[in-house]
């Protein structure tokens, strides 16, 4: 489906599956987003996924690809045609020497001590000047879901392979972009015109306080105003 999924295990080091504290960070042509966090319900470390995938993938860094659009398509009335798959091509000219973050632009999703003092090549890094809106959703049960909405002239408001990242997890509570009735974590769109509306979906396991806020803005003009529209009450809430 055009998205890379990176497992980020950011707390509670254990080989016991139910003690895992982590989630899937994602990256595609629109950009990267860090993993969902739900740690406080498992232990009291309050750890969060903070690593955002970028242009470079570290040596030995594993990732998943997927042809599914929906993690759980049962009962979903999506009008997106299935992705039938194809070839994943890794070309030699994509290779570059780049140091791991924070000294470089490469992200490795496992904590390790730096063992090198070499200097990165840095010659192939592209400066991203596209506009991006990063939202953060806090659920009643403590899930923290980051979402990305980004502008790219090659994208549309419908599903675009490589620009829209489908939800790959089945969480008890979550928030996601709705594109043609399917769920996405990253959405690429052609513009941020003032008449644009981008549907959001919520999944909750109990009643309680829900927070939706702007986590970060990238290359967005200061005079742009953003609102959350409650579809049931038709009320608007300014969030910037």
Q: Where are the language model's segments positioned?
A:
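Compositionally biased Ser/Thr/Gly- and acidic/asparagine-rich
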Residues: 1-240
């Amino acid at each position: 489906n055009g998205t890379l999924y990176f497992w980020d295990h950011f707390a509670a080091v254990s080989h016991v599956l139910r003690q895992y504290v982590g989630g899937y960070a994602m990256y595609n042509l629109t950009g990267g987003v860090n993993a969902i966090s739900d740690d406080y319900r498992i232990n009291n470390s309050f750890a969060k996924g903070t690593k955002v995938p970028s242009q470079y993938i570290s040596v030995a860094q594993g990732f998943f690809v997927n042809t599914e659009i929906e993690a759980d398509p049962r009962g979903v009335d999506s009008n997106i045609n299935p992705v039938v798959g194809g070839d994943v091509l890794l070309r030699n000219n994509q290779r570059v020497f780049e140091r791991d973050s924070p000294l470089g632009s490469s992200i490795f999703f496992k904590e390790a001590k730096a063992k090198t003092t070499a200097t990165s090549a840095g010659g192939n890094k592209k400066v991203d000047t596209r506009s991006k809106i990063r939202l953060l959703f806090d659920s009643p049960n403590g899930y923290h879901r980051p979402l990305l909405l980004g502008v790219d002239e090659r994208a549309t408001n419908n599903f675009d392979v490589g620009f829209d990242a489908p939800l790959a997890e089945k969480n008890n509570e979550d928030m996601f972009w709705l594109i043609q009735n399917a769920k996405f974590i990253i959405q690429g769109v052609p513009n941020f015109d003032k008449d644009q509306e981008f549907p959001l979906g919520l999944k909750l396991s109990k009643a309680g306080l829900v927070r939706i806020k702007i986590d970060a803005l990238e290359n967005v003009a200061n005079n742009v105003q953003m609102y959350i529209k409650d579809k049931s009450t038709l009320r608007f809430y300014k969030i910037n």
